[in-house]
């Protein structure tokens, strides 16, 4: 679809697609966006080496802003990761070492850059300014502008205390650090818009207020709704664990299947948020019923996987799904994995079969699965997944871990 422009009401487009939960000044922000390029930031603490589907709404929102000509900033919390955001958590996050934080930053940047074009100035680490600020200086510049009474009214803090869970002074100060980040990005990069999930509302408005109290630029904040699936699961989680956005943690095939298996009631909402289809097409697909709705789920799975892993990976996952699930298997209804005899004669290994069909993310992942005893043929562990297969695999049961079972079928 055509990209929105500065002059169009971008806020209205984002609202129509379901991205907007709260805004500090909707009309002011709409005018600000229409006036010309705006620098907006989205922040992540480096608590893992990837992002998951729960972060995807923010990535897509930033993508829409960039398509409209605005400037994205990715803020990595190299400093705040050492503290941990207490928002709506019952316990402290584990403290990570510097080497792990840097490895996590590298992984997050790789994921982010698939959704948003990053240039040399697009990536910022808050350690750049927080590592150098003194405690007394911070209290003087920032602490004087915050009331403890008001901070205690914010849901993220109040709920933690109401449940009588410990909240360290370190964590209590997190919201001040995030407010300081916003002001520093405004000063250093001309950033005037912060994006975040609904649980970040208090942190965002504290930054807006801090800039005002210090006589700085007018800042804006926009939060997105916290998503849950219709069956009540937190977005980004599946029965098997987190739905990661990098292939090293989750194979593209499994990522594709997450979207293909979504609840019927989520299809239209997810198409609006996680694809770039025009809204007329989103509404048409979302209105389908019965078996036709499954085709809409395939469209969703293809679109989401193409953005996360590339068009080739999306096609491979879709092709694998058609081959695996189109026909019923002859053994207890197991899904099929088809192997051509020609390919078998060329020396096909289980490692190649699983990677080529997007059933595993990499050769290394297959070898690790085999080394742990999780790769089995007819219940027997596969010692060497790199060994060439023979015609004897026809009809045999292939198990990947305890829950995923397939049947191999030779085709002429």
UniProtKB/Swiss-Prot annotation:
Where's the motif 'HIGH' region? Answer: 46-55
Catalyses which reaction(s): tRNA(Tyr) + L-tyrosine + ATP = L-tyrosyl-tRNA(Tyr) + AMP + diphosphate + H(+)
* Recorded superkingdom: Bacteria
* Cellular location(s): Cytoplasm
Keyword vocabulary terms for this entry: Aminoacyl-tRNA synthetase, ATP-binding, Cytoplasm, Ligase, Nucleotide-binding, Protein biosynthesis, RNA-binding
Pfam families, per database record: tRNA-synt_1b (PF00579)
The UniProt entry lists the main location of this chain as cytoplasm
Q: Which residues form the S4 RNA-binding domain?
A: 348-411
Cross-referenced PROSITE patterns = S4
Where in this protein would one find the motif 'KMSKS' region, according to its record? 234-238
Q: Name one GO biological process term.
A: tyrosyl-tRNA aminoacylation
Cellular component (GO) terms are: cytosol
The entry's L-tyrosine-binding residues are 41, 174, 178
Keyword Ligase annotated: yes
The keyword Lyase appears for this protein:
no
Q: What class of enzyme is it?
A: ligase
Q: Which family does it belong to?
A: Belongs to the class-I aminoacyl-tRNA synthetase family. TyrS type 1 subfamily.
Assembly, per entry: Homodimer.
Q: What does this protein do?
A: Catalyzes the attachment of tyrosine to tRNA(Tyr) in a two-step reaction: tyrosine is first activated by ATP to form Tyr-AMP and then transferred to the acceptor end of tRNA(Tyr).
Q: What is this protein called?
A: Tyrosine--tRNA ligase
Biological source species? Pseudomonas paraeruginosa (strain DSM 24068 / PA7) (Pseudomonas aeruginosa (strain PA7))
């Amino acid at each position: 679809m055509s990209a929105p422009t500065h002059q169009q009401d971008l806020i209205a487009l984002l609202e129509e697609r379901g991205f907007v939960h709260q805004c500090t000044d909707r009309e002011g922000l709409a005018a600000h966006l229409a006036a010309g390029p705006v620098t907006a930031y989205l922040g992540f603490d480096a608590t893992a080496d990837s992002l998951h589907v729960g972060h995807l709404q923010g990535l897509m929102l930033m993508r829409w802003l960039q398509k409209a000509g605005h400037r994205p900033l990715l803020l990595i919390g190299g400093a705040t990761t050492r503290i941990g955001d207490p928002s709506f958590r019952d316990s402290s996050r584990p403290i990570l070492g510097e080497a792990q934080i840097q490895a996590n930053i590298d992984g997050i940047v790789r994921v982010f850059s698939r959704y948003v074009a990053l240039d040399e100035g697009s990536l910022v680490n808050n350690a750049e300014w927080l590592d150098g600020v003194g405690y007394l200086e911070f209290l003087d510049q920032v602490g004087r502008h915050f009331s403890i009474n008001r901070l205690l009214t914010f849901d993220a803090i109040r709920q933690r205390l109401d449940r009588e869970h410990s909240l360290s002074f370190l964590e209590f100060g997190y919201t001040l650090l995030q407010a300081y980040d916003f002001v520093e990005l405004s000063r250093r990069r001309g950033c005037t818009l912060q994006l975040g999930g609904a649980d970040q509302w208090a942190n965002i408005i504290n930054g807006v207020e801090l800039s005002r109290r210090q006589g700085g630029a007018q800042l804006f904040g926009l939060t997105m709704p916290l998503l849950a699936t219709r069956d009540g699961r937190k977005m980004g989680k599946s029965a098997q664990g987190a739905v990661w956005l990098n292939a090293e943690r989750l194979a593209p095939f499994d990522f594709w299947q997450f979207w293909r298996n979504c609840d019927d009631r989520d299809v239209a909402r997810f198409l609006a948020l996680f694809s770039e289809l025009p809204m007329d097409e989103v509404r048409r697909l979302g209105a389908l019923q019965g078996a036709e709705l499954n085709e809409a789920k395939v469209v969703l799975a293809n679109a989401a996987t193409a953005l996360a892993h590339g068009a080739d990976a999306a096609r491979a996952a879709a092709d694998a799904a058609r081959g695996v699930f189109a026909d019923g298997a002859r053994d207890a209804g197991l899904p099929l994995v088809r192997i051509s005899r020609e390919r078998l004669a060329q020396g096909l290994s289980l490692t190649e079969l699983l990677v080529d069909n997007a059933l595993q993310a990499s050769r290394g992942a297959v070898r690790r699965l085999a080394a742990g005893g999780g790769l089995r043929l007819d219940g027997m562990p596969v010692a060497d997944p790199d060994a060439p297969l023979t015609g004897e695999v026809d009809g045999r049961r292939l198990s990947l871990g305890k829950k995923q079972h397939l049947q191999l079928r030779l085709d002429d």
